[in-house]
Amino acid sequence: MKKKENDYAFIDSQNLNLNIRNQGWILDFAHFRIYLKEKYGVSKAFLFIGYVEDNKKLYDFLTRADYICIFKPTLEYKDGSTKGNCDAELVLQTVIELPNYDQAMIVSGDGDFHCLVKYLLEKNKLRAILIPNRDKFSALLK
């Protein structure tokens, strides 16, 4: 009998979404979750995302698609742009969950996760880094 895989994915939603869009694509989050489960045996997928009140329907959809959404309050700037960087939350949650998973997948091309990747490698807990855009990612993740 095959051992049930117990790998978790930690997803930088902003990095994923922006890099997919910059390539002219729109990500189907529901199918991406299925892909993570079927291809990599991901039992839990944590999605780190800035919280915007008007996006409640999106968050409900993501939850129904089997993501565990971790929200960060966003800041709105005078020019109308919003900022909700979730890097610290992703690192912290990955370390909090460490005893609960076999291996982690990090979905991001952001070099801010270099120290996390190094730590997971030292603990033999890194399954893979999924980089949304192979042509545009931090050299720190090579």
Give the role of each language-model region.
Residues M1-C86, L121, L126:
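Domain-level signal for Mg2+-assisted phosphodiester chemistry and nucleotide/NA-binding surfaces
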Residues F29-A30, D87-L92, H114:
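Short, well-ordered alpha-helical scaffold segments within catalytic/effector domains
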Residues K4, D87, D135-K136, K142:
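Residue-level detector of intrinsically disordered/flexible regions characterized by low predicted structural confidence
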Residues Y101-L141:
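Active-site histidine-anchored catalytic micro-motif
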Residues G80-G109:
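Internal catalytic-core helix/loop-beta-alpha segment
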